[in-house]
Amino acid sequence: MVKKNYKNITLDAKYTPKKSEPYMCPEQLAYFYQILNAQRDEILHDREAVLNDVRMAEKNESAGVGDEQDQAANEQEITMNLRMSERTTNLLQKINAALERIENGQYGYSVISGEEIGLQRLMARPLATMTVEEQEEYEKKKR
């Protein structure tokens, strides 16, 4: 798998990868790079807002603001926000791994077999790391 220069490509806003193009050509890589970067930026923005909420709730809790019900609600909100932050951290790790695969020329290819994952699958799930068949087999074994 060869590294391809995708960072300097400006795509038309209506561009979508096509089967007629060479698989993981620079335009396709630029497309997925932009999608993944946008997802990462949105998550980082949302995560910062959640962390600010947690800080505020912790501040209120430590200051003893509100009655027992308010404090219980604050504690529940802190717990829920921390769980959500944990999930977003996991998602960020997957996005960063996908961006790294783009960088090293492995994006779009199965981490198991090296086979093409396929444009249709990547369009639906840009974080996919396996072919549909491999994913189904993985899910069966997991049960």
Task: Report the location of each language-model feature.
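Cys/His-coordinated zinc-binding microdomains
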Residues: 36, 114, 135
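Short Fe-S-cluster ligation motifs
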Residues: 136-143
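Short Cys/His-rich "knuckle" micro-motifs
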Residues: 120-125
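Short functional micro-motifs and their immediate structural scaffolds
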Residues: 100, 117-118, 139
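Cysteine-rich micro-motifs
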Residues: 128-135
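Residues immediately within or flanking Cys/His clusters that coordinate Zn2+
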Residues: 89, 107, 128
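Short cysteine-rich clusters marking metal-coordination/redox-active sites
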Residues: 110-114, 131
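Interaction interfaces in information-processing and related assembly proteins
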Residues: 1-104
